[in-house]
Amino acid sequence: VASMLFGLFFGAGNLIFPTAVGQLAGRNMWSAILGLLITGVGLPLLGVAALGLSRSDGLFALSSKVNRPYAYFFTCALYLTIGPFFAIPRCATVSFTVGLEQILPQNGNMKLYLLLFTLAFFIAALLFSLRPGKILTWVGKILNPFFLLFLGILVVVTLVSPAAVPVSSVEPMGGYIQQPFLTGFLEGYNTMDALASLAFGIIVVQVIRELGVDEPGAVARNTAKAGIFSCLFMGLIYVAVTAMSAKSR
């Protein structure tokens, strides 16, 4: 379950923003990473734990504790933000840019290539989504292990290679010059995992119930445990990716 939750959390933004921190923070990298971890790991953990411990049936039920109009507004705003407004387009464009754009003919019609890739990408996503009962198998047992294997190879190869310039002597850029912690803090929030945790938490609850755990207290404890393990692992990945990016300048 923790592996599945990690796979749900770790999307395009989880590679973009730690990489940017490594490239721009320079010698202020560690204070920037601390800020990144607070909002990129700490807030998602609190979100998953809140949904599990509240024993709510979903985001709408949780936000209904304020009142129903607020619940409708907050639920719609959150799903639009982590869905069609920001996160969904980012997943397709980053996958295309990182995975295909560099090997396609540079004199070709990139907009057409992106359109075709996007259609194929979201058709595949739709096929997975139509079988929610298989999400633990597809994400937790198949996609996530392959992703971690390839990412691990990339991180190890980069970290064992000597850096051209020591990170401690690299000048920071942009907001990392004066406010590295705050800039990293904002970058961690930009992953949008703090918002996504409120949506993913109910998926964890449903999967735990499908595994035969029905007692509310046990469901809450197992949800919190899944959140802790997945977020700790995500934090380790953030540190590794940031360090890798810093060494590859």
Where are these regions (language model features)?
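Select transmembrane alpha-helical segments in multipass membrane proteins
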Residues: V1-L5, W30, R68-I82, Y113-L119, ...
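Hydrophobic, membrane-embedded alpha-helices of multi-pass small-molecule transporters
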Residues: A2-F10, L80, V157-A164, M173-M244
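TM-loop-TM module centered on a large, flexible mid-protein loop between adjacent transmembrane helices
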Residues: G58-S64, I237-R249
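Membrane-interface loop-to-helix entry segments
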Residues: L130-T158
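Hydrophobic transmembrane alpha-helices that form the core helical bundles
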Residues: A20, A71-P105
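Juxtamembrane transmembrane-helix boundary signature
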Residues: G35-S63, T75-P89
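Transmembrane helix-boundary motif of multi-pass solute transporters/channels
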Residues: V1-L36, L46, R55-L62, V204
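Extracellular loop-to-transmembrane helix junctions
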Residues: G22-G47, V66-T75, Y113, F233-L236
